């Protein structure tokens, strides 16, 4: 992602902290969203780009979800993807952990792939998303699981562990730290800093669905422009004016000159096909709940995550904005007293589990054992 497109104007210390601890924007209330009865209603052994993966569909929390699964025995590890991704982001982890004796499951999250995508924006708040995760355990007949989340999956995983520690007994968060609920409405803070300049989170919150209209017009361009390493070469951006009025997001990024070595053409084709089916509105609705999530979390301010936790990110991930291990540890230690380790992988960017699968898998196995 083009750094200038995300950072203009210069980020102040206050807003930098807000962005580093982005996970706290998604805090929520456990009341009012008890998981409904869940069940597996269909199993499909075929139609998977990853050999050995079994697809199944479950009914839970008012929606139909697709699960990708490997390994039928052993402790359950639940992988939660972010934006703009799919279950397929976890392909390397599904193979490695199932080979190590774990039962591993990666859903298409609400609004993605072949999982249902409700129209109502409030159906994507963190309360609903956390209830979806519990519903998966219920459908699989599992009492507990380790939950692993990346990008938007990180706050979902964090809050699932916060609200349901008896079900999610270990937590791994990737790229997006968790530091509890902040004092200021996060969207108000962003608007105060960026004003009439472009910032993608504010763009995703504009009325009228402008963001998904842009992204749906060319899913391949968006995904190929996002799925890159920090040093991947790009074309020059078509828009360099920082003002929102100058245009949308894609012309600001700069198209990729080629795929990174960790992403094959077949990988990209599969993920593109998933967004051609589902569109981008579901994923954008996660951003549209940032303010709602903040408003309904007041009674969670004093809660902390009690389960053992690992944080993992690429050292060049722009979400952490150059934070050191010590800075990240300090920002999370109050909200996660049992934060066992912070791992930053050098020369790795945002797509950590795909860019560095060997190191990611080893970190997961060390933590799980």
Positions of predicted regions on the chain:
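Flexible "cap/lid" subdomain of the alpha/beta-hydrolase fold that forms the substrate-access gate
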Residues: 40-44, 48-53, 63-65, 112-148, ...
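Signature tryptophan residues that serve as conserved aromatic anchors
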Residues: 83, 87-90, 152, 158, ...
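Conserved HGGG/HGGXW glycine-rich cap/lid loop of the alpha/beta-hydrolase fold
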Residues: 69-116
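Bacterial N-terminal signal peptides that target proteins for export
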Residues: 4-19
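Conserved beta-strand scaffold positions in the cores of enzyme catalytic domains, especially
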Residues: 55-57, 104-106, 341-344
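Boundary at the C-terminal end of the N-terminal hydrophobic targeting segment
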Residues: 30-32, 38
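Bacterial N-terminal signal peptides
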Residues: 19-29
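Catalytic active-site module of serine/aspartate enzymes centered on a nucleophile-bearing elbow/loop
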Residues: 338-369
